Amino acid sequence: MEDELRCPTCKQLYANPVLLPCFHALCLGCALDIQTPYSPGSALPGAVNGAGAASAAGHNGLHGNGGGAGGGAAAPVTNPNGPGTRHSSHSSAASTASSNTGSESVTSDQDQSDKVSIFSEADSGVVCCSNTSRPVSYAGTGLLPGVGNVVAPPGAAYCLTCPLCRKLVFFDDGGVRNLPTYRAMEAIVDRFCAREALRCQMCETDPKVASLICEQCEIRYCDACRELTHPARGPLAKHTLVKPRGAAQQRESVCGEHEETLSQYCLSCKAPACGLCIGELRHQAHDVQSINVTCKAQKTELSHNLQQLSEKARSTTEFIQRLKGMSDKVTESCMEFERLVHAQCEALIQAIHDRREYLLEAIRMDKDTKIRILKDQQSNCTGKLQQTTGLIQFCIEALKETDSAAFLQVGSMLINRVTNTDMTWHQEVTNAAPRVSPIVDLTLDDAALARAIDNLNFIQMRAVKDGDERCPAAPMTPTILPSDCSAENNSVTVAWQPPNHSFVEGYVLELDDGSGGEFREVYCGKETICTVDGLHFNSMYNARVKAFNSAGEGEYSELIGLQTAEVAWFTFDPVLSGGAGSGLIFSKNNATVSVEGWEHRVALGSVGFSRGVHYWEFTIDNYTADTDPAFGVARIDVARNKMLGKDEKSFAMYIDRQRSWFQHNSIHERRVEGGITTGSTIGVLLDLERHTLSFLVNEMPQGSVAFRDLYGVFYPAVSINRGVTLTMHTAMDAPKMDYF
């Protein structure tokens, strides 16, 4: 509470507090210090120019409840620039030194931020009288110089700016001494100071209650010590002795004008009054109540409001205590979590140690196996060598035999043994290689584990109550990696980075329609990179991604725009064209096609179009037979064993050496002169903005628009048979047609 009892200017406990019209308080001395003389044309302290509404002062008498001083009544204030009016009042009790001259104060809200106006439309003009028996009236309409359209009260001699709300108050010659004494604040300060047990500072033992304090010496005295140590003579005679705070006597509120007890309260003027005041003209027809009844009602209302505020304060106190308890719990929880992380890391380290022992044991076992195999092979080779050496030595000894009959007895056998040994030696010994490599042909794949260690991190858990099962929170937002995203032809690749501190079960990638329309899901899975094919050409696609887990879905990432190619690049698609059994022969990276049989076969391009303008050409590489190749577009389910245009799924132009026809659903029409030979070019222009199909032969239009009202997805198509070879050229700009 002590902060409420300190002056905003001197920061000390209030001394002789006075009440401003804005209901803020100041020490009387501080108010005297900060009030400034005012004269028309002078600058206002803290005021800025503006265009705010003006406030005109009213007039009336206000009866104060101060010690012997009169007051003035709150007057209604009319805003000349608007319809709003308001009554403002406050208790008035001037000091004994107050003059008999009335004063008028005008308050204004000062807005330092936008510098629009220093006066609010709700501000009021107040007439304050010191000790007068007549109402004081100021009816001036002059503008306050330098403050826009604010009406300056005539006769203003002083002004003061409230240090708290920056409202401006004007006074007459009496200045701030016309302000009422803030008796409630004064009493509260006295009671607050009385708690400090103000004792005499000069008593040697058992200090008595101080009765006076010297303002110059700043020492408290009881009556006995004052007579002994601070006599009122000599230099001490000029010192001022006052009662210490807390020693104020209870004073009865009396009317400053009639010296009568204030027993009534005017609800219209919102001011206390005595019995004589009620009988005067200014309170005629006003609603009047007993001052005790009004005081009791306001105390009851204040008590009720205080009870509600006390409940909130109690709740806030409990909340603060809970926060303090949570601080302790945070420390305890963090210590427990540190122990858990330490234990988990130790478990991981132990798992790595166990795995290391397993891997080392596997290496030792592999070593033992290889050594055993090599020893077995060495033993086998040694045995073979010993047998061969024994045979050689035996043969040498046999060659020493001089008895021909004896040698011939075994000669054939030895020749066969040596020959067989020599033949098998090449297989068993000469070409024999070590059965195992002396080099360990293994390597430790630790890249995945290293990445896992690098990615080892915390995941955010969902906040739960004590005792509830903890589970991961919904994941945070993934981050799209622009450097890893790309667009090629009619496909886009989007890559993203997993969110930090989140448990993710999967991702959802969404694309719009390439025209800023609604998003649709194109991928759902655990990968962090995705390529989407089959998009429109020359379109800007916006992509976004979000993560999800069992707890819910996270927020979408920021958008990334990817532009597909302006013109289409494609080839023939052997699979869409019927596969290996179609009889079509593709070459030059599927750009050239031919066929062996006499039956027409349809070849389709690798992309389908549903939007945009697209153009491609065919070059006739070989045209030796009397046949009619057909060029155009088809749907994906076109009949592949008929000439293009024979069914309702295809739109084509078939042409020979002299002329051409347009054909759809076996209906051919509009013959156009002009055919093809080897080296001719056929151009196909598919305009899905106008939904038309046109053809060109040798870069010249072949008739007018061939087909109209084409909607859906169409694939480039051609049908040929034996004797025709052609090559398709794509990624070409569409020619300008002048017959549209």
Swiss-Prot record:
- Indicate the segments annotated as coiled coil, or none if absent: 294-324
Question: Positions of the zinc fingers (B box-type)?
Answer: 195-244, 250-291
Subcellular location, record wording? Cell projection, Axon; Perikaryon
Top-level taxon in the UniProt lineage:
Eukaryota
Give the compositionally biased regions (Low complexity).
74-105
Which residues belong to any copy of the Fibronectin type-III domain?
474-567
* Primary location class: other
Explain the induction of this protein: Induced by neuronal activity in C4da neurons.
Q: Where are the zinc fingers (RING-type)?
A: 7-30
Catalytic activities: S-ubiquitinyl-[E2 ubiquitin-conjugating enzyme]-L-cysteine + [acceptor protein]-L-lysine = [E2 ubiquitin-conjugating enzyme]-L-cysteine + N(6)-ubiquitinyl-[acceptor protein]-L-lysine
What are its GO cellular component terms? Answer: axonal growth cone; neuron projection; perikaryon
Where is region (Disordered) located?
A: 64-114
Function statement = E3 ubiquitin-protein ligase activity. During embryonic and larval development, regulates the pattern of axonal projections of class IV nociceptive sensory neurons (C4da) downstream of netrin receptor fra. Regulates fine-scale topography of C4da axon terminals upon neuronal activity. During eye development, consolidates the attachment of R8 photoreceptor growth cones to the target medulla layer, probably downstream of fra.
PANTHER family per record: E3 UBIQUITIN-PROTEIN LIGASE TRIM36-RELATED, E3 UBIQUITIN-PROTEIN LIGASE TRIM9
- Please identify the protein, giving its name as recorded: E3 ubiquitin-protein ligase TRIM9
Query: Could you tell me which species this protein originates from?
Result: Drosophila melanogaster
Gene encoding it? Answer: Trim9
